């Protein structure tokens, strides 16, 4: 059977990764830090993925979960994978888009340098039993907190349930290449 080992580590502290064995077949990186502190968030998100990849460089595939928050705001037009990047979450999460872009950059660099088969998956609006953006909107409504909408209406989102992206993990791992699949 295919098992998973969940390991808790502080990716901002490279030394905390010393607990990791080096014989993983696959690594799935769902980690994200949104503290608002640029130094810490860049260390945890960008340097952290690099340190993790260096520690696990003999894997069959590395899957890094990113976000569509990396894209520059472009109105109502759908985004292609090669759409311009930008800091579109700055108002609510000052460090989020930038640290996600930085993490993707470090992920690509290490994959190329170490020849690690890698896929970067940019999820849109993930949600599930443990919460997500829509859950936070419901909490805001319960508390009478207004939900800001972008003035360029309508506001389109592509919710993605955890069951759906988990089902795709084997395909995302199979698509991994050292050139990096996005």
Name the predicted role of every residue range.
Residues 16, 47, 51-55, 106, ...:
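Conserved mid-core alpha-helix of short-chain dehydrogenase/reductase
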Residues 105-157, 162-171:
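NAD(P)-dependent short-chain dehydrogenase/reductase
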Residues 51-95:
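Conserved Rossmann-fold NAD(P)-dependent oxidoreductase catalytic core, especially the SDR/UDP-sugar
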């Amino acid at each position: 059977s295919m098992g998973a080992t969940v390991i808790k580590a502080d990716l901002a502290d490279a030394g905390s990764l010393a607990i990791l064995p080096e014989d993983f077949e696959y690594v799935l990186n769902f980690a994200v830090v949104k503290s608002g502190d640029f130094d810490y968030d860049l260390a945890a998100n960008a340097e952290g993925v690099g340190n993790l990849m260096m520690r696990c460089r003999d894997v069959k595939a590395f899957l890094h979960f990113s976000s569509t928050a990396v894209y520059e705001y472009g109105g109502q037009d759908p985004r292609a994978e090669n759409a311009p990047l930008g800091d579109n979450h700055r108002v609510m999460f000052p460090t989020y888009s930038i640290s996600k872009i930085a993490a993707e950059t470090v992920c690509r660099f290490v994959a190329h340098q170490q020849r690690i088969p890698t896929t970067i998956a940019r999820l849109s609006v993930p949600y599930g039993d443990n919460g997500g953006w829509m859950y936070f909107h419901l909490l805001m409504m319960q508390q009478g907190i207004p939900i800001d909408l972008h003035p360029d209406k309508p506001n389109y989102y592509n919710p993605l349930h955890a069951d759906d992206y988990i089902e795709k993990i084997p395909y995302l791992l199979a698509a991994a290449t050292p050139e990096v699949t996005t």
